[in-house]
């Protein structure tokens, strides 16, 4: 019934198995991939023909994690998986980026990749395995795909590169880098690092590229026995159209791309485009080409002319040379009632970034396959349509916004203080108000400024820069701080963020083969110079974190209590801690290890809560004077509540220095009194005295103290 084919190899000390022919047989391509004991199913379906009028390649990648894979049941009312999590969105992008350039130009059939995690061994992250499974499924599917693609994770532990480290090993690694590519080219890099230099980062990329070569061999081996017949796809030949269009519009397009202002340049390009359309799509008579074909070739021609201009003149669209960064203006504190704020402007790209400090109860709970954990640093990136002068959809963030936010998050996180150094939850929101290239790197710079403005003790300021690379034969040009127009014209787009001393995040997308290690080294070196320049410009606004928090930020005091006292502080059903919060106004968060965080914008509220908690967990000291409240009177004395919830007896003989006939003659219920702890009787009951304390001042009376000592 099943025509099953399997290939198995040893990869980084664990078995990797690729199987096809048994599951999801109606998909164009389906591969069940197992690494260790983590299992994913990757499927590919591509329509047999493009939709009419389709002018782009509609590729969709959906990565989904099923909770049953880790033996769990989803939370929530419906008890089933809902909208994609942040990780599912990020891994979908991770799979998409290296495969998209390998579909032939002109292929516009609707194509969907679905990757499902169906088993997780809690040791091997399914993201790299999903990339491998997708590549294998595409290679087998018969869909035109110039693969296969391999992928690997690289760690850097104790000065050594580690291929596909286990999840628990990543805690010790100063690098988390995922690389993907073909036999002879690196296509994609995504990473977070702890201030590593350019040589170490490039070495990790090449180490990972070498490390996934056996995976490519395994995919080819499987394809030799299980691949479907390749679909007959021949891209249309538009060389005649391109040649004619070049003759018609080259001069005007070259002039248009000499205009440095974005709006004016766009207007000039639109005028050339209108002329081209009028020529090739006449209102009268039959047109030789469709509007989609003319539009696509015009776009292709734009890219060619910009590339030629840059390689020939070493001058950019906006008049800069290859290495110049656009003018930068940095401002902090522009929103004084927020906890920290910054406005970062680089050319026509601008971000308002606001930092907010919160308490432990503001941490985000993340329910992943590996277990529930709390995230104390949140970074949200918003890209409204007005930032590029357009109208568009508003609402929940799209994949691009989530991906850009995570890139900035990775860049900043290595420089954050530990929870012990700074016990706050941090949320940063980046509002992109203008965009003409590299808004994600503007977010990195703005986040660094806003956090320093908020008084968050960053280890060092962080900046980011977006780079491009154009390669034609043996000529190449590396572009620093690319514009939006330059973003899609290059052969390599990469974003580098870090401090003056090293890289904290690197994202790279390479679209062609032929980019050597040496070219990448030159590009990273140029990026380092640009990053240092940007840090210098940022330092004009603020050089280090402010010594104190903003006026409106909450204050947090940390204290530690014995673990066995946590129950007493919380109380039955949370009764005690609720009372403390209600009476003092402070927010209180108690960790399982006995760490207590007390937060409020008022120092008095924090101190009141601290004293209350201290009175619950500490033991009263014999000989000390405490303030208390009379809670009950009796013939033989008064019961006084002191030191938190403790009660003790002031015997009638200890109420006053003179003889007392009736307790109520001295105190009544509700009276505030000062008492001294004399000790404990044979049954452990608390013995208190009022007569040895001056009830007006709370100070001990010297003569009474001597009498008491003599009596003892």
Swiss-Prot record:
Protein's UniProt name: Polyribonucleotide nucleotidyltransferase
Domain S1 motif: from-to ranges: 623-691
InterPro entries linked: ExoRNase_PH_dom1 (IPR001247), ExoRNase_PH_dom2 (IPR015847), ExoRNase_PH_dom2_sf (IPR036345), KH_dom (IPR004087), KH_dom_type_1 (IPR004088), KH_dom_type_1_sf (IPR036612), NA-bd_OB-fold (IPR012340), PNPase (IPR012162)
Protein's organism: Rhizobium johnstonii (strain DSM 114642 / LMG 32736 / 3841)
Gene3D superfamilies membership: GHMP Kinase, N-terminal domain, K Homology domain, type 1, Nucleic acid-binding proteins
Domain KH: 554-613
Localization per Swiss-Prot or TrEMBL: Cytoplasm
The protein's required cofactors: Mg(2+)
Functional summary from the UniProt entry: Involved in mRNA degradation. Catalyzes the phosphorolysis of single-stranded polyribonucleotides processively in the 3'- to 5'-direction.
E.C. designation(s): 2.7.7.8
Family to which this protein belongs: Belongs to the polyribonucleotide nucleotidyltransferase family.
Gene: pnp
């Amino acid at each position: 019934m099943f025509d099953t084919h399997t290939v198995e190899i040893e990869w980084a000390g664990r078995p990797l198995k690729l199987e096809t022919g048994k599951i999801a047989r109606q998909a164009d391509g389906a591969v069940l991939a197992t690494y260790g004991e983590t299992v994913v199913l990757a499927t590919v379906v591509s329509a047999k023909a493009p939709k009419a009028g389709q002018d782009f390649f509609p590729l969709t990648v959906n990565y989904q994690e099923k909770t049953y894979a880790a033996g769990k049941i989803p939370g929530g009312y419906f008890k089933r998986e809902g909208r994609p999590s942040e990780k599912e969105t990020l891994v979908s992008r991770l799979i998409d980026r290296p495969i998209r350039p390998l579909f032939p130009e002109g292929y516009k059939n609707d194509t969907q990749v679905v990757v499902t995690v169906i088993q997780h061994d809690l040791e091997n992250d399914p993201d790299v395995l999903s990339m491998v499974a997708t590549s294998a499924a595409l290679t087998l599917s018969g869909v035109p795909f110039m693969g296969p693609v391999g992928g690997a994770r690289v760690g850097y532990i104790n000065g050594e590169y580690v291929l596909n480290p286990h999840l628990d090993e990543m805690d010790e690694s100063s690098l988390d880098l995922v690389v993907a590519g073909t036999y002879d080219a690196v296509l994609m890099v995504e990473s977070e690092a702890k201030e590593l230099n350019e040589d170490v980062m490039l070495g990790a990329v090449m180490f990972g590229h070498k490390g996934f070569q056996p995976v490519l061999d395994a995919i080819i081996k499987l394809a030799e026995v299980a691949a479907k017949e390749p679909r007959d796809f021949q891209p249309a030949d538009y060389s005649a159209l391109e040649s004619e269009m070049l003759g018609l519009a080259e001069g005007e397009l070259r002039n248009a791309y000499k205009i440095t202002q974005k709006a004016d340049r766009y207007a000039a390009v639109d005028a050339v485009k209108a002329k081209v359309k009028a020529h090739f799509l006449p209102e009268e008579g039959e047109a030789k080409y469709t509007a989609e074909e003319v539009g696509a070739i015009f776009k292709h021609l734009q890219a060619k002319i910009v590339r030629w201009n840059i390689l020939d003149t070493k001058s950019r669209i906006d008049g800069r040379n290859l290495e110049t960064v656009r003018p930068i203006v940095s401002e902090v504190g522009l929103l004084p009632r927020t906890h920290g704020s910054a406005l970062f402007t680089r050319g026509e790209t601008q971000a308002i970034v606001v930092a907010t400090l919160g308490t432990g109860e503001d941490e985000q709970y993340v329910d992943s396959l590996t277990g529930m954990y709390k995230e104390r640093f949140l970074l949200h990136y918003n890209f409204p349509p007005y930032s590029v002068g357009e109208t568009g959809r508003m609402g929940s963030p799209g994949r691009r916004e989530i991906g850009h936010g995570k890139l900035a998050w990775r860049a900043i996180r290595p420089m954050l203080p530990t929870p012990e150094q700074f016990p706050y939850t941090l949320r940063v929101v980046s509002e992109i108000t203008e965009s003409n290239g590299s808004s994600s790197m503007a977010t990195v710079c703005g986040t660094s400024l806003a956090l320093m403005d908020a008084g968050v003790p960053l280890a060092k300021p962080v900046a980011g820069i977006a780079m491009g690379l154009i390669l034609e034969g043996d000529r190449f040009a590396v572009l620093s701080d690319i514009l939006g127009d330059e973003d899609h014209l290059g052969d390599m787009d990469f974003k580098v963020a870090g401090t003056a001393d090293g890289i904290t995040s690197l994202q790279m997308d390479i679209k062609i083969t032929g980019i050597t290690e040496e070219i990448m080294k030159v590009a990273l070196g140029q990026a380092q110079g640009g990053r240092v320049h940007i840090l210098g410009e940022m330092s004009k606004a603020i050089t280090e974190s402010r010594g104190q928090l903003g006026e409106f930020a909450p204050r947090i005091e940390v204290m530690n209590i014995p673990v066995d006292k946590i129950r007493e502080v919380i109380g039955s059903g949370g009764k005690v801690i609720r009372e403390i919060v209600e009476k003092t106004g402070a927010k209180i968060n108690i960790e399982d290890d006995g760490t207590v965080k007390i937060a409020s914008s008022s120092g008095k509220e924090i101190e009141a809560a601290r004293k209350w908690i201290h009175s619950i967990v500490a033991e009263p000291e014999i000989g000390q004077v405490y303030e208390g409240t009379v809670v009950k009177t009796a013939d033989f004395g008064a019961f006084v509540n002191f030191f938190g919830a403790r009660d003790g007896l002031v015997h009638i003989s200890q109420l006053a220095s003179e003889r007392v006939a009736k307790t109520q003659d001295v105190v009544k219920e509700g009276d505030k009194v000062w008492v001294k702890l004399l000790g404990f009787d044979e049954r452990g009951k608390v013995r208190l005295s009022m007569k040895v304390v001056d009830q007006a001042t709370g100070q001990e009376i010297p003569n009474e103290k001597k009498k008491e000592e003599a009596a003892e």
